[in-house]
């Protein structure tokens, strides 16, 4: 279940996120909300809410 902040998107306060991994082939990072454990793909475009399956595919070395 997403927290209220994640329900409205990836936005400040950003200190609620922790970086789990970086994609060496693209400028993107796997971020996890400290409140609800939602996974986000932070990149140069619009951050994307990820399923665990999609996150494992994008970041195979990450501990999710």
Language model feature labels by segment:
Residues 12-15, 39-43:
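Short, non-ligating residues that shape and space the ligands of small metal-coordination modules
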Residues 1-24:
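Short recognition patches in nucleic-acid-associated and regulatory proteins
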Residues 16, 31-33, 61:
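Short beta-strand element of the conserved SAM-dependent methyltransferase core
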Residues 26-29:
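Residue-level signal for mature regions of secreted extracellular proteins and peptides
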Residues 7, 34-37:
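Cys/His-coordinated zinc-binding microdomains
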Residues 19-23, 43-64:
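Short, intrinsically disordered terminal segments enriched in charged and Pro/Gly residues
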